[in-house]
């Protein structure tokens, strides 16, 4: 998928997940992927759920607005985030030093 792309108020992006991390945080860009560290293990979809919950909480949106569209069993996840503006996304990145 590559770089984040917008369709109206919907963001499409690729995230690289680091499961079983000591601290949940946004680690920065790794190429065209945003790297996110999560506490959850990569078992039974726990890391996928944790990723959607983490992003929703950090963006101040409902969990249902963050959808995993590809990468259920991979560290590389393609997500769709609905109902946010580019300015909210930019604030999120700045808040995490990205």
Curated annotation (Swiss-Prot):
Any Pfam family: DUF167
GO annotations of cellular component type: cytoplasm
SUPFAM superfamilies, per the entry: YggU-like (SSF69786)
Taxonomic superkingdom: Bacteria
Annotated InterPro entries: DUF167, YggU-like_sf
Family that this chain belongs to: Belongs to the UPF0235 family.
HAMAP family: UPF0235 (MF_00634)
Name used for this protein in its record: UPF0235 protein Mmc1_3654
Native species: Magnetococcus marinus (strain ATCC BAA-1437 / JCM 17883 / MC-1)
């Amino acid at each position: 998928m590559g770089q984040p792309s917008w369709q109206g108020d919907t963001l499409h992006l690729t995230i690289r997940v680091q499961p079983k991390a000591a601290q949940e945080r946004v680690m920065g860009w790794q190429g065209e992927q945003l790297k996110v560290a999560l506490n959850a293990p990569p078992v039974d979809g726990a890391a996928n759920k944790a990723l959607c919950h983490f992003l929703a909480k950090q963006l101040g949106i409902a969990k249902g607005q963050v959808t995993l569209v590809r990468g259920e069993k991979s560290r590389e996840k393609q997500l769709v985030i609905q109902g946010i503006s580019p300015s909210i996304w930019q604030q999120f990145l700045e808040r995490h030093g990205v």
